[in-house]
Amino acid sequence: ANGGWPGPSISNGSIAVVPTGYTFLCPLDPDVNLDINCTNDYDALNDGLAILRGLYGLMGETLTKNTGDGPCTSQWGGQYVETRINNMFYELDVDQSGDTDAMSDGVLIMRYLFGLRGAQLVTGFTSSAEEVEAYISRLMPALGELTPECPWHKDAADCNLPQQTVTVTLSKSKIGVGGNVELIVNHSAPDDSGLAGLGLRLHYDSSLLDIGSIENSLQEGVYPFQVLDDTSNYDGDANTDKYLLTSWAELSSDAKGWLYDDFNTSTLYKVSFTAKDGYQETTLKFSASSTTYGHSFTGADINIGFSPDG
């Protein structure tokens, strides 16, 4: 609204003017950023979930349950996250409504950190996606190197963390041009894990496959899904140029964890693909946009062969 200007019109007593836009001339305090737990990383299920819970009014250790407390919280106690959120409360008004609120600002921050962009970022809200993205990006200045110690740096040597594992069941192992295949995507983790959720990317080659229907089998803590261009090459494969992003989070700190009642094992969703002209064979891959604190991620490649019969 008002070209991005957050305030009322400006008047000299006879003429009212609404600016067409605005920029922030003063840099933010370097401590005002979304790395709430001081790991030198921005993460939905660590930083974002703690912020969302904090905006709902949760305090102390209930903020960080299943999210990890990070190096600074370990040093200074569980109330550190609460203090950081309180200190940057007004800056967390990411939709610039004049009111910092869990159901709007907290959810938008979570969606952004999971990787949602554009219309899917603001679905259900009246905010401008462009303005929300620009505002949140200001709260994410470049950080130093990842905290090297386990479990904050999940790729640290000899980390050996428990894993959130994703596997796929295929309706058929081979398809031809015009043929369809359905993927059933399943999740598992050690049954004693207290999970916060998962941000999941399924990478594919859009020159060979058209994505079809997507059915969320798991409604617990689900966020919108979105197909995005893989400009960052998250899976390390130059052949896959797009990915399907799906996300889940356990908001409540009272619950034992996401999927706990299902022993951390569940079907996440089903998705179908159709082979395009020129199809021979292809490999789809997984990567994670966010995992539960103290867990790493693994997802096996999905090889779909070629059959002239479709």
Predicted regions and their residues:
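Cellulosome-associated attachment modules in secreted, modular CAZymes
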Residues: 2-167, 200, 247, 309
